[in-house]
């Protein structure tokens, strides 16, 4: 079904779409998935910087490659995560599995078990959502 003002869930993405379109980069499901990926990656980097003993040999020069996972996040990446979610029936777990696949591509298999280490889904959501609000305010509502 094509999204129109008549079949949208709310007037925000229906009748007012022309005024709220820029907010989809912050508040759409794809955006939430991207923010979750960002939080998971930055948390992993934070564990490396502690340094957590098991991550002490992680090369900090790889941090930018890790960040590129969310900095270059695409709609196809979001679709991959949704496909994983269709198996896991868990949105945040699907993000974790996606990142583990990305670690495999980067040949970082030895560190995969520290993705989402010590976290709950609420830890991710309760950080991702406020970050999306903060960014929307600074980049859309109150731009420089």
For each feature predicted by the language model, list its residue ranges:
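A helix-coil-helix interface module used to build multimeric assemblies
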Residues: 2-144
């Amino acid at each position: 079904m094509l999204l129109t003002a008549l079949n949208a869930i709310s007037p925000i993405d229906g009748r007012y779409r022309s005024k709220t379109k820029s907010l989809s980069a912050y508040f759409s499901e794809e955006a939430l998935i991207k923010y979750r990926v960002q939080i998971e990656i930055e948390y992993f980097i934070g564990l490396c910087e502690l340094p957590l003993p098991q991550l002490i040999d992680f090369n900090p020069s790889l941090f930018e490659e890790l960040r590129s996972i969310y900095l270059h996040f695409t709609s196809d990446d979001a679709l991959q995560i949704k496909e994983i979610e269709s198996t896991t029936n868990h949105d945040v777990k699907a993000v974790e599995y996606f990142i583990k696949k990305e670690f495999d591509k980067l040949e970082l298999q030895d560190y995969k078990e520290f993705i989402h280490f010590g976290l709950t889904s609420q830890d991710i959501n309760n950080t991702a959502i406020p970050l999306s609000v903060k960014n929307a305010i600074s980049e859309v509502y109150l731009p420089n």
